[in-house]
């Protein structure tokens, strides 16, 4: 696989990892009778701050997947992955780092770092979009 497809697969897999983690914790909460099976909200607002951050980190991935994943797939399908390959791993690293920071803290420094990671992703996405239109 080329770097673009590896990054796309990594993005999808990372999103899946966050989902599996969230559902494993939810399953444990139900099994231990800490929360009833129908006692969950989509944003985990009735659970711990970590679970709320996990729900948001997963949602961030799902929200970004059609945009950034779409650009990667367009590049591959159009035979233009030379546009996306050079920055594909940087994109994936910024995505994963954003999620990890999101999970770890909500301090001002963490939010700033998280935003910086997202800014890197947006910059790469805009660059890819422009280059794909011009290619």
Residue ranges of model-derived segments:
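Core segments of transmembrane alpha-helices
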Residues: 59-73
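Interfacial loop-to-transmembrane junctions
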Residues: 97-123
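Short membrane-interface loop/juxtamembrane segments of multi-pass integral membrane proteins
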Residues: 40-61
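Juxtamembrane boundary at the C-terminal end of a transmembrane helix
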Residues: 126-135
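Transmembrane helix-loop junctions in multipass membrane proteins, especially transporters and channels
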Residues: 27-31, 80, 107, 111, ...
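Hydrophobic residues within alpha-helical transmembrane segments
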Residues: 10-13, 58, 89, 93, ...
């Amino acid at each position: 696989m080329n770097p673009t497809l590896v990054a796309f697969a990594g993005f999808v897999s990372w999103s899946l990892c966050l989902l599996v983690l969230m559902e494993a914790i939810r399953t444990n909460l139900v099994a231990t009778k800490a929360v009833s099976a129908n006692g969950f909200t989509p944003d985990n607002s009735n659970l711990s701050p970590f679970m709320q951050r996990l729900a948001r980190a997963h949602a961030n991935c799902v929200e970004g997947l059609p945009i950034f994943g779409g650009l990667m797939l367009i590049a591959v399908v159009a035979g233009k992955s030379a546009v996306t390959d050079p920055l594909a791993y940087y994109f994936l690293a910024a995505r994963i780092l954003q999620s990890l920071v999101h999970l770890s803290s909500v301090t001002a420094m963490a939010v700033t770092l998280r935003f910086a990671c997202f800014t890197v992703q947006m910059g790469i996405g805009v660059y890819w979009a422009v280059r794909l239109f011009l290619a």
